Amino acid sequence: MASSTMALSSPSLAGKAVKLGPTASEIIGEGRITMRKTAGKPKTVQSSSPWYGPDRVKYLGPFSGESPSYLTGEFPGDYGWDTAGLSADPETFAKNRELEVIHCRWAMLGALGCVFPELLARNGVKFGEAVWFKAGSQIFSEGGLDYLGNPSLVHAQSILAIWACQVILMGAVEGYRIAGGPLGEVVDPLYPGGSFDPLGLADDPEAFAELKVKEIKNGRLAMFSMFGFFVQAIVTGKGPLENLADHLADPVNNNAWNFATNFVPGK
């Protein structure tokens, strides 16, 4: 509508502006409010899903007993188990839930980063140092650190410069995840979507709900894996794939029990 008001020629209305409809700014403003309300609504999950609701899968199956009243099966990864009562307070639960999901994502990336370079090195790809906990120390060597073993890719010689780059890049991503940015508005900081979901995996509510469960399950396994990688590095001084190869070659002598008993006093 080119104009929302007009002056009528009738004597009784002469010189008076009569409003025929809402202005463009009002239309746009209302549209924005409606869009935000729609985007902010949680996507519902059908009650037939085995991962949500009161009849969801529990941590001990049919022997799980009664779940705490505050664990209703609303969120992914809720198996009705909270012996320490960490989820009893809603605010604490919301904070811990966000921390868990973020740590899950970092652990999945970290586990892949620990295994993949060593896997490539064992298959003929040349790295300066493929073992994850030894690679970073190469920056203190005389020649510095070459990313992926390629001096023409990224040649790092300053740990402070690496730290600054990490803070800037990770801070920018986290800031956008929480507060939004020029690429779009973020409605849910935990599942921002938009530019963080270029493949549109979250478009279907049912598929998205199942992907949330898969993410939290794989993330919890990844956190345990990272803990195991740290312990292996301290005890054996080897990477995860080398430890796996040693175990498969001699499972009787190369296992967690034998390594643990080496620390028994008097042995």
UniProtKB/Swiss-Prot annotation:
It holds the Pfam family Chloroa_b-bind. It comes from the Eukaryota. It is a multi-pass membrane protein. Its main location: plastid. Belongs to the light-harvesting chlorophyll a/b-binding (LHC) protein family. Signal peptide: none annotated. The modification N2-acetylarginine is found at R36. Chlorophyll b 2 binds at R105, V154, L183. InterPro entries: Chloro_AB-bd_pln, Chloroa_b-bind. Chlorophyll a 4 binds at N218. The light-harvesting complex (LHC) functions as a light receptor, it captures and delivers excitation energy to photosystems with which it is closely associated. Chlorophyll a 2 binds at H103. Chlorophyll b 3 binds at S158, E174. It is found in: Plastid, Chloroplast thylakoid membrane. This is Chlorophyll a-b binding protein, chloroplastic. Residues 1-35 form a transit peptide. The lineage of its organism: Eukaryota, Viridiplantae, Streptophyta, Embryophyta, Tracheophyta. Photoregulated by reversible phosphorylation of its threonine residues. The LHC complex consists of chlorophyll a-b binding proteins. It comes from Spinacia oleracea. GO terms for cellular component: chloroplast thylakoid membrane; photosystem I; photosystem II. Chlorophyll b 1 binds at Y59.
